[in-house]
Amino acid sequence: MRRRLPIVAALLCGLALLVPSTASASPTTHSRTDAAAGWLARQLVDGERFEAVFGGVAYPDQGLTADAVFAFSAARTADAFADRAITWLARPEITTGYVGSGGESYAGPHAKLLLAALVKDKDPTSFGGVDLEAGLLALLTPSGRFSDQSAYGDYSNAFTQSLALLALDRTATGAPTAAVDFLVGTQCADGGFPLTFGATPCVSDVDSTAMVTQALQATGRHTDAQEGLTWLVSVQNANGGFGVGSAAPNANSTGLAGEALFAGGRFTAAFKARGFLKSLQVDCSGAPADRGAVAYQASGFDPATATRATAQAVLGLSGVGLAHLDGGGDDEDPVLACS
């Protein structure tokens, strides 16, 4: 009988390996922010990246992956996924494929990766073999604009300029005054900010104004930022949402505007924006795999747009601005509690 005990023990151990472990299951949460971040984490390819598919071919989507890093940092959850994402972004071929190489150099990607690296406490002077800070500063023109160096044209805009200021403000040298002045100088007469520089007439844009006001708040230009926030509040829909022009409100614009309003102390409007984002979120009546995701618009969940919508919605749900993102938090990918 005693000789059989090791055999029985071995069989029991083997069976234990076949039983699913509940320890690795995603925890449940009642937090809408955490549920959105958890859903976003589970959409990552191999738990580390996003891809864009064109013509049946998958290409790396560094921009959306960086957005996910920002979302996880804002929610203070899914940090293990943020760690894997930043490691993927720091692969040399992924970094240079985004910021440019061989004479091509892009302001927006440099700024976005620099911000992501700093949020995750990585060395930006050697990220994927690239000095992101030096590379970005090399794109600063005499006017104060950070411009692309490319044979395909200059696609820098209010987004890229704002990201540059937000990223450089975290560095030892800070954001160049000329770059801040340039951005302030693009303000439209109504107080908002346009996406495209130098366009006539000057047309204020929700997404751009949300980004610019955060950059100006971070760099000490509070009066100009507050003027932009006043314009944002003036174009907020009654349901709390924000849209592009006269289009219906959407999660992306509302997420960006919401975080800007929180950062600027416009709490009444910010909470209205958060309420709209919650109304777009898949709740317990939805398919289990979709719960926590944020739909792009009120028309409902669409997997083609939900990933990017959720990434930016998390910013508005959390109320944490880009200037205050900090890596860390819980490692898990929580699911919405429905019991």
Question: Residue locations for each model-derived region?
Answer:
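Buried hydrophobic core positions in alpha-solenoid tandem helical repeats
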Residues: 40, 89-90, 136, 183, ...
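An alpha-helical repeat/solenoid feature that recognizes helix-turn-helix modules
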Residues: 26-33, 50-81, 98-129, 146-178, ...
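Secretory targeting and sorting signals
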Residues: 1-25
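Alpha-helical repeat scaffolds
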Residues: 82-91, 126-137, 271
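Primary recognition of N-terminal secretory signal peptides and signal-anchoring hydrophobic helices
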Residues: 29-46
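N-terminal low-complexity, Pro/Thr-rich disordered segments
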Residues: 20-29, 328-339
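Intrinsically disordered, low-complexity N-terminal segments that are enriched in acidic
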Residues: 88, 92-100
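Short, charged, amphipathic alpha-helices and their helix-cap/turn boundaries
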Residues: 129-142, 177-187, 227-234
